[in-house]
From Swiss-Prot:
Keywords: Isomerase, Magnesium, Metal-binding, Phosphoprotein
Stated name of the protein: Phosphoglucosamine mutase
Gene name of the record: glmM
Any coiled-coil regions, as ranges: none
Native source species: Thermosipho melanesiensis (strain DSM 12029 / CIP 104789 / BI429)
Entry keyword Transferase: no
PTM summary: Activated by phosphorylation.
Length: 428
């Protein structure tokens, strides 16, 4: 059974992701590093169980486990970079509460595929240290403070005193720290979905459910919505319209270029990024590179070619001069900084970037390899003047079909044809 997917080990708790897996991962990591390992988690009820198993595995290999408590993925990434250490984030990001995950970080970065494959092989055996060398468990209470101080230094110029902001923290890892930091910069906040109970993370809230926050938008208010582990965000503008990752990339790329922060005058997108964004960037003399879907592939391209900015429509945006990973809070501050400098409304900024209609359908299947079927390829070849992208989910039993083009009715019809075909093939 393959454990690592597109974003670490992730699945339904006690069906796929068990305490034994957490223990084995901790034991392997403890045998790979020679100092300490930092652990953080989001607000899922299963986080405590997985944390204790992970700690047992780490300490059984003779390494100290530093428990950071509830913390965002980007904050943990910063801690591991500052401490030159490894870390494990216990979170399933935007997935519902019955899911959880284990994401390994090394000096701020996610692991490359070959290291994950090595870890997975090593997890088949357990290696204990001698009893005198068992690691210690340390409650690391300074993680939030270290992250807060870092953000304050990076954005010391920022004044958000004119901003009225609804903040949806998704009952997740951002529920305390992000509002505190935004208030520090002067924004007037209305915080929602900030009472996690272990079972309500991402439940009809956060970046995957903007429809509920739209009801709170009145007057000059705007909203920012985070996911469960805080590595991404989207906005809702004054008109109640979504300001998603493509819009974020377009607007902030212009400012990064003006500030000489946009290395090689290039932005990294994915195959799902809207053609309207690409046109906007090229019209502003900014080059574009596309990668596979997933922030890990965006980051790989950025590191390989020394680019500063990359991201995807879902709100995973990487500002590599500020962070080693997607960071919802840094994204928020970059967008609000652009908003303040422009003197415009968020809606006005949004309208600068064309957005071709897109329809995405998620097809639940038993066999995710169905998308390679010849009949699917034949239908794709028959589609002219519209963009069709079909790919399996890395974390769910789902095939995703994206259709993009100028006519909404037409792309909806195309998407439905693929849905019906894949469903029919999955029955065979």
């Amino acid at each position: 059974m393959k454990l690592f997917g597109t974003d670490g080990i992730r699945g339904i708790v006690n069906e796929f992701l068990t305490p034994e897996i957490a223990f084995r991962l901790g034991n392997v990591l403890g045998n790979m590093v020679d100092k300490k390992i930092f652990i953080a988690k989001d607000t899922r009820a299963s986080g405590d169980m997985l944390e204790e198993a992970l700690v047992a595995g780490i300490t059984s290999a003779g390494v100290d486990a530093y428990k950071c408590g509830v913390l965002t993925t980007p904050a943990l990434a910063l801690i591991t970079r500052l401490e030159n250490a490894a870390g494990v984030m216990i979170s399933a990001s935007h997935n519902p509460p019955e899911y959880n995950g284990l994401k390994v970080l090394m000096r701020g970065y996610k692991l490359p595929d070959d290291i994950e494959e090595r870890i997975e092989r090593e997890m088949e055996k357990i290696r204990y240290c001698e009893y005198k060398s068992v690691g210690k468990v340390i409650e690391y209470d300074f993680a939030s403070e270290e992250y807060f101080e870092y953000i304050k230094k990076q954005y010391s110029f920022l004044d958000l005193s004119g901003i009225k902001l609804v903040v949806d923290v998704a009952n997740g890892a951002t529920y305390k720290l992000n509002p505190q930091i935004l208030e520090y910069f002067g924004a007037k906040l209305e915080v929602v979905n900030d009472r996690p109970d272990g079972f309500n993370i991402n439940r009809d809230c956060g970046s995957t459910h903007p429809e509920n926050v739209k009801k709170n938008i009145t007057g000059s208010k705007i909203a920012v919505l985070y996911d469960g582990d805080g590595d991404r965000c989207i906005f809702v503008d004054e008109k109640g319209e979504e300001f998603h990752g493509d819009k974020i990339l377009g607007i902030t790329a212009i400012d990064l270029k003006k500030e000489n922060r946009l290395k090689k005058n290039n932005v990294v997108l994915t195959i799902l990024s809207n053609m309207g964004l690409e046109e906007f960037l090229k019209n502003n003399e900014i080059n574009v590179v596309r990668t596979k879907v997933g922030d890990r592939y965006i980051l790989e391209e950025m590191l390989k070619n020394d680019y500063t900015l990359g991201g995807e429509r879902s709100g995973h945006i990487i500002y590599r001069d500020k962070s080693t990973t997607g960071d919802g809070l840094i994204t928020t501050l970059e967008v609000l900084s652009s908003l303040v400098k422009s003197g415009l409304t968020l809606h006005d900024l949004s309208n600068r970037i064309p957005d071709y209609p897109q329809v995405m359908v998620n097809v639940e299947v038993k066999n995710k390899e169905i998308y390679k079927n010849k009949k699917v390829f034949s239908l794709m070849k028959s589609i002219k003047d519209y963009r069709v992208i079909i790919r399996p989910s890395g974390t769910e039993p789902v095939i995703r079909v994206l259709v993009e083009g100028p006519d909404l009715e037409k792309i909806t019809d195309i998407a439905n044809k693929f849905y019906e075909l894949i469903k029919e093939l999955d029955k065979e």
